[in-house]
């Protein structure tokens, strides 16, 4: 918007007993490996880490960027302090507004990095939102939280890096530990690691407590015509 030439964006979070005990009290921790979007999912795995990116205005660029942040949105459905609405209202608004701000069509989205925590409520809610937006054809999607866990305050920064690398390297990441589709939506994520895939547009979701939902849309800048 012409306010800054560049900004460093991202997040970091570290595990501690307080956080672990808090999630345990909510009874949403999986004591084995989490299973995002699977029928048998029981909860999440916590992780820790950091992820940062540099955003630059087009006029300040001195080299070819990895990609463009073409769309973004932050919404709050205020449904519950720790839960998402069953119909996925917050996720629906967040994704819809991010896509609308980018000016691209639904059919142009090549991959979705879903929030996909592995909890029964989150995955059903996000799945409902995906169905509401895309209908029968949902683009290839997966959750990387089966690799890295839910890194909480770092998750959006880390998963933005995954999304940028998806475009830059032509990658689609597998949704680990998936066996059976959840009955709420019947959605089936990508389960194999794919390389050399022409990826032009990636939608990345990060949803938080209190219904605070964010979606980012990254787009290639040098994709062949």
Give the location of each predicted region.
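Alpha-helix termination/capping residues and helix-transition junctions
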Residues: 1, 62, 66, 103-106, ...
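Conserved beta-strand-centric core segments of catalytic alpha/beta enzyme folds
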Residues: 1-60, 155-225
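Beta-strand segments within the central parallel beta-sheet cores of soluble alpha/beta enzyme folds
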Residues: 4-12, 66-72, 107-114, 140-146, ...
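Short, glycine/acidic-enriched loop or turn micro-motifs at the edges of active sites
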Residues: 14, 59, 74, 116-118
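Acidic-glycine-rich active-site phosphate/pyrophosphate-binding loop
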Residues: 18-32, 65-66, 123-141, 212
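Condensing-enzyme catalytic core mediating Claisen C-C bond formation in acyl metabolism
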Residues: 29, 33-102, 111, 223-224
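Short glycine/threonine-rich loop-to-helix capping motif typified by GTGT followed
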Residues: 79-88, 117-134, 152-158, 191
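A beta-strand-loop signature enriched in Asp, Gly, Thr, and Trp
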Residues: 94-150
């Amino acid at each position: 918007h012409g306010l800054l030439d560049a900004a460093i964006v991202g997040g970091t979070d570290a595990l501690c007993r307080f956080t672990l005990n808090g999630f345990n009290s909510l009874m949403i921790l999986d004591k084995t490996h989490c299973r995002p979007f699977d029928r048998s999912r029981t909860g999440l795995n916590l992780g820790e880490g950091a992820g940062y990116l540099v955003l630059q205005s087009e006029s300040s660029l001195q080299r070819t960027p990895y990609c463009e942040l073409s769309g973004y949105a932050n919404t709050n459905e205020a449904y519950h302090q720790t839960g998402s609405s069953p119909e996925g209202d917050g996720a629906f608004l967040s994704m819809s507004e991010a896509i609308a701000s980018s000016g691209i069509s639904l059919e142009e989205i090549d991959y979705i990095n879903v929030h996909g925590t592995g909890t029964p409520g989150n995955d059903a809610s996000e799945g409902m939102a995906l169905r509401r937006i895309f209908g029968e054809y949902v683009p290839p999607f997966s959750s990387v939280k089966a690799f890295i866990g839910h890194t909480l305050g770092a998750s959006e920064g880390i998963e933005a890096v995954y999304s940028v690398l998806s475009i830059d390297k032509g990658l689609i990441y597998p949704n680990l530990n998936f066996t059976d589709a959840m009955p709420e939506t019947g959605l089936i994520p990508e389960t194999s690691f794919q390389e050399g895939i022409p990826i032009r547009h990636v939608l990345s979701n990060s949803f938080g407590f209190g219904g605070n939902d964010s979606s980012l849309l990254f787009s290639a800048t040098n994709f062949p015509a």
